[in-house]
A protein has these predicted regions:
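Metal-ion/cofactor- or nucleotide/acyl-coenzyme-handling active-site neighborhoods
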Residues: 1-240
Length: 240
């Protein structure tokens, strides 16, 4: 069966998500998501147990959400199963065998790899380009904004690497307009069609003007680099 998938991150554009198909969330996404089919968590087991309130656990159980954990977190499995949460161990060995790479810079990379693991393709097409025959043929990104002067600059390349693997398999990755993922600093192709240095060094989408669709986003904080230091900076438009 060919189907769509949403990978829901925790960035500002998460408010655009319409949950129109199977939805996978990451780490603290359980706190705001309207539905989740899977929740991938790679934080330490102490954080995973202490930070999830009974109310959130009840919500995940109501969704029928499966919690996907690394095998090294097996010690917390009884805790979640005891409150009715289904547990799935991340198939790391199968992923490493199929893709022959260890380039995973954050949880989103693991999520993309997991989706592509279950996707089959054919090259027997008129164009010779790959076509999906089963699994996910369209992956929608929401909340995977990865603004390039924040701590995400250390992770962004990994996500884009897996986006490239997806494209090479004929899988379409559909991102939000306000995301910096898969884009140059100014949204232009280098060296073509009037490309110049105008705006060089300017953040792709400045914090103070970020809006997602027609919705304002709450004021939150993100790590950003200032000189040699990392500082927390606010973003959002202040909706209550």
């Amino acid at each position: 069966m060919i189907q769509d998938l949403i990978i829901l991150g925790n960035g500002p554009s998460r408010y655009e998500c319409n949950y129109h198909c199977e939805t996978w969330g990451v780490n603290g996404g359980y706190a705001f998501a309207k539905k989740l089919d899977k929740l991938f968590m790679t934080d330490g087991p102490d954080v995973m147990v202490e930070d999830i309130s009974p109310e959130c656990l009840e919500k995940l159980a109501t969704y029928g959400c499966t919690l996907v954990l690394a095998s090294r977190f097996s010690e917390v499995t009884p805790y979640y199963e005891g409150v009715g949460i289904k547990i799935e161990v991340y198939p790391i060995e199968a992923v490493l065998k199929k893709f022959n790479t260890k380039f995973f810079s954050n949880t989103i990379c693991y999520m993309l790899a997991n989706a592509l693991l279950d996707t089959e393709i054919t090259l027997d097409t008129p164009s010779g380009l790959p076509r999906v025959t089963s699994g996910y043929n369209r992956i929608f990104f929401y909340g995977i904004d990865m603004m390039t002067t924040t701590s995400y600059q250390q992770e962004k390349g990994g996500v884009e690497y897996w986006m490239g693997i997806a494209k090479g398999m004929g899988v379409e990755v559909i991102n939000t307009k306000s995301s910096a993922t898969g884009k140059t600093y100014n949204g232009r192709m280098y060296g073509w069609w009037g490309q110049d240095n105008e705006g060089e060094g300017v953040l792709y989408a400045p914090w103070e003007i970020i809006k997602v669709g027609k919705k304002e986003i709450p004021i939150e904080e993100e790590w950003a680099k200032s000189g040699e230091d990392w500082i927390k900076v606010p973003y959002g438009t202040g909706v209550k």
